[in-house]
């Protein structure tokens, strides 16, 4: 079918075609190799923005540190990190004046959270720097390793299960003269492979104990590992992101809880809400500015961009904010919240894997780890890398760079939003005391500023005042990248506003298509994505119908399940034809079994099994959904499952879809090749956790599952539960006397073993 693309736009207002200009089709770019160069860029840039600050030396680690706070006021438009403490505190005071009691209430809410949060909160999240192994690990493993090592050193407060008690352990660990850790090491040996009779290198992982002195431990506790941010669209250069360790994570969580609670009460904050709720918030601010500007005033909107938001923020400023926000609160609470910014003021950025070199004729390859960069001869490097290394050398300690100023990406999104909103708050007429006034929206580093004034000069004056106020708080509005329009047309966090929000449909494109989980989930996710886009993103009925047809086609090609009466030959077509011929009611066959598609845009909300149930042959029903059929997935499937869909920007978000357990909801097995790598020890740990958790769930089925109260360990809880259950079963005659005696004996044996250990 030939379509002339210009015809598509004849009836479309230009602003609705915005989505065709977004770089969202095709695969996003991924980074390869090491992030060392990007991390060095970040460290060097951050120091450059604050270069006129004061240098000091950290007494514990000996790391040189740059403090730009209350530094010189800017003389030009170059980005700088010289925030002024008194200005930040005053902005906070004005924010509180406009919202009486906001800080007080948020502190009370947070205090409650602090006392109730459990350690397992820290298992959420992806990669975490594991300080015991000096590399990244999944969050749950890193937490377990940390707690294991703490226990080895006599720090056991975290066994209560409360996060706040784990943080007490962290604080105490910093005072210890030495920490004993369990770390992994690799042994390589050459062995002859039985099958191929060739010599192969076999790696084994062993565990060994090692002692860290106070300085080494503190350096590790303050270290953020860095990786390259993947899949960023519309950018030529990659950039580095930070993965903090377990010591920092818990403290950051509480600070962000407080900041989130404040953001929820601020109408100018684009966080923590999202989607339609965020659009409603935005529309309210715009409406307010438009109605007030009626005939007498002009109203203009800046689509704002800040230069290097993270690299000019400063943890010391966040400490000042927290000190102010919590000023009437109990001492313990203030201490807990001030630790995160203090740790960030003393942070070390790990430079990642280092550089890979290969000789001209590609014969030799060698890895130069980051630890060696401080001493290696620089003639091997090209000019740009040489400059980077020279610049960063004075800051290096053990392969990590001292990085006191700057925040690293994604750490204090909520708190930095509070800082941004405090400037927007200063735009009220009673504060500006002039003819112009402003309001706007802030979401992390993204902002939209609406300025009202009687004439153009007033607008200009308002923008200038906003710009200068930002500078005083360490925020640098980019004059090159921000642009101004009559209010009614602007962009904020990729929402395009033109007298109402324009659907930016291209952003959703990556989530269309077959996810590749399994036949059952993929069908469900595919139709749910289409349904959601009809609700939220102006996907019209005709386009939705077409999307559905394309999806079904894609699905059939992916799983080779073309209709039973098709001519297409695939690996599965023989089986599918056989099933088709022996089925009486062909409409009842699932698409993945070669059946017809019964979906249209009216019934997308119904899972396919339910949609076709009445049409199925009874023996087909019996095979498809019979719990005794070994191929029906026996995972306890909730009625709602979560899939991860990739929107075009921001983190992968989870989307709910209906799940019906059938023979098609299989779960693929783990790839075995991991068993031969250095990760094997970790895998064994993970399997051990899995087994323990499964066992625990057998004793405490979810219906009766209350969090164990008191400080009993998992084993103690299970033993006492086993005794109670056995007694009940024995007294009601469900088990014989011999069985009861046997169970009691096993329980006693377990307790004896625990005592001996």
Swiss-Prot record:
Catalyzed reactions: RNA(n) + a ribonucleoside 5'-triphosphate = RNA(n+1) + diphosphate
Region (Disordered): 52-78
InterPro entries named in the record: RNA-dir_pol_NSvirus, RNA_pol_PB1_influenza
Protein EC: 2.7.7.48
One GO process term, biological-process aspect: symbiont-mediated suppression of host gene expression
Post-translational modification: Phosphorylated by host PRKCA.
Residue ranges annotated for the RdRp catalytic domain, each copy included: 286-483
Cell compartments where the protein resides: Host nucleus; Host cytoplasm
Subunit annotation: Influenza RNA polymerase is composed of three subunits: PB1, PB2 and PA. Interacts (via N-terminus) with PA (via C-terminus). Interacts (via C-terminus) with PB2 (via N-terminus); this interaction is essential for transcription initiation. Interacts (via C-terminus) with human PKP2 (via N-terminus); the interaction competitively inhibits the interaction between the RNA polymerase subunits PB1 and PB2.
Protein's UniProt name: RNA-directed RNA polymerase catalytic subunit
Organism per entry: Influenza A virus (strain A/Swine/Wisconsin/1/1961 H1N1)
């Amino acid at each position: 079918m030939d379509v002339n693309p210009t015809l598509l736009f004849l009836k479309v207002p230009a602003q609705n075609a915005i989505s065709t200009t977004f770089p969202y089709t095709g695969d996003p770019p991924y980074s390869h190799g090491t992030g060392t160069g990007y991390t060095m860029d970040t460290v060097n840039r951050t120091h450059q923005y604050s270069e006129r600050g004061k240098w000091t030396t950290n007494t514990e680690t000996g790391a040189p540190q740059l403090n730009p706070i209350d530094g010189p006021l800017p003389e030009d438009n170059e980005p700088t990190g010289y925030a002024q403490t008194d200005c930040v505190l005053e902005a906070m005071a004005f924010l509180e004046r406009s919202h009486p009691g906001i800080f007080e209430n948020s502190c009370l809410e947070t205090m409650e959270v602090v006392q109730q949060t459990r350690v397992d909160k820290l298992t959420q999240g992806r990669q975490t720097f594991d300080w015991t192994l000096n590399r990244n690990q999944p969050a749950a493993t890193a937490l377990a390793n940390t707690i294991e090592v703490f226990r080895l050193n006599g720090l056991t407060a975290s066994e209560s299960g409360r996060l706040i008690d784990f943080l007490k352990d962290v604080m105490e660990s910093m005072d210890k003269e030495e920490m004993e850790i369990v770390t992994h090491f690799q042994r390589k040996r050459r062995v002859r492979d039985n099958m191929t009779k060739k010599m192969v290198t076999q790696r084994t992982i062993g565990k060994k104990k090692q002692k860290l002195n106070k300085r080494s431990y503190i350096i590790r506790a303050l270290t953020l590992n860095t990786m390259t941010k993947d899949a960023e669209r519309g950018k030529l250069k990659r950039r580095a992101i930070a993965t903090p360790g377990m010591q920092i994570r818990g403290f950051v969580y509480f600070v962000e809880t407080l900041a989130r609670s404040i953001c929820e009460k601020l109408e100018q904050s684009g966080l923590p809400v999202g989607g339609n709720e965020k659009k409603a918030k935005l529309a309210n601010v715009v409406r307010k500015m438009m109605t007030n500007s009626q005939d007498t005033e002009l109203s203009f909107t800046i689509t704002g961009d800040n230069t290097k938001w993270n690299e000019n923020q400063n943890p010391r400023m966040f400490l000042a904010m927290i000190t102010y926000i919590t000023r009437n609160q109990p001492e313990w609470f203030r201490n807990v919240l001030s630790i995160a910014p203090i740790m960030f003021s003393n942070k070390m950025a790990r430079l990642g894997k280092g550089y890979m070199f290969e000789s001209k004729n590609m014969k030799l390859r060698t890895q130069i780890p980051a630890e060696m960069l401080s001493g290696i001869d620089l003639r091997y490097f090209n000019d740009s890398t040489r400059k980077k290394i020279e610049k960063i050398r004075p800051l290096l300690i053990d392969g990590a760079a001292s990085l006191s100023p700057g925040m690293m990406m994604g750490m204090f999104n909520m708190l930095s939003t509070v800082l941004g909103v405090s400037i927007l708050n200063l735009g009220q007429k009673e504060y500006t005391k002039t003819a112009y006034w402003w309001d706007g929206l802030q979401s992390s580093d993204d902002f939209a500023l609406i300025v009202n004034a009687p004439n153009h000069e007033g607008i200009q004056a308002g923008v200038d005042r906003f710009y200068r106020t930002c500078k005083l708080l360490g925020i640098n509005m980019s004059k090159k990248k921000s642009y101004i329009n009559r209010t009614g047309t602007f962009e904020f966090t990729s929402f395009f506003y033109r007298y109402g929000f324009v659907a930016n449909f291209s952003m959703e494109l990556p989530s269309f298509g077959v996810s590749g989980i399994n036949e059952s989930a993929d069908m469900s996710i595919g139709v749910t994505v289409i349904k959601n886009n009809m609700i939220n993103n102006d996907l019209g009925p005709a386009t939705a119908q077409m999307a559905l047809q394309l999806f079904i086609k894609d699905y059939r090609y992916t799983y080779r399940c073309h209709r039973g009466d098709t001519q297409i030959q695939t690996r599965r077509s023989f089986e599918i034809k056989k099933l088709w011929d022996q089925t009486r009611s062909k409409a009842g066959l699932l698409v993945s079994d070669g059946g017809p598609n019964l979906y249209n845009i009216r019934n997308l909300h119904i899972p396919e099994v339910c949609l076709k149930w009445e049409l199925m042959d009874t023996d087909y029903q019996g095979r498809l959904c019979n719990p005794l059929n070994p191929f029906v997935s026996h995972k306890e499937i909730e009625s709602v499952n979560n899939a991860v869909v990739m929107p075009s920007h921001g983190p992968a978000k989870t989307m709910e879809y209906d799940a019906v357990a059938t023979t098609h909801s299989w779960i693929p097995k783990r790839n075995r090749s991991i068993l031969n790598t250095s990760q094997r020890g970790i895998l064994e740990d993970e399997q051990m956790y899995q087994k323990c958790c499964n066992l625990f769930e057998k004793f405490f089925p979810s219906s009766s599952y209350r969090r164990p109260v008191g400080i009993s360990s998992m084993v103690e809880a299970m033993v006492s539960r086993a005794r109670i259950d056995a007694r009940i079963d024995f007294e009601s005659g469900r088990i014989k006397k011999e069985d009861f005696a046997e169970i009691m004996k096993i329980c006693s044996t377990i307790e004896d073993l625990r005592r001996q250990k």
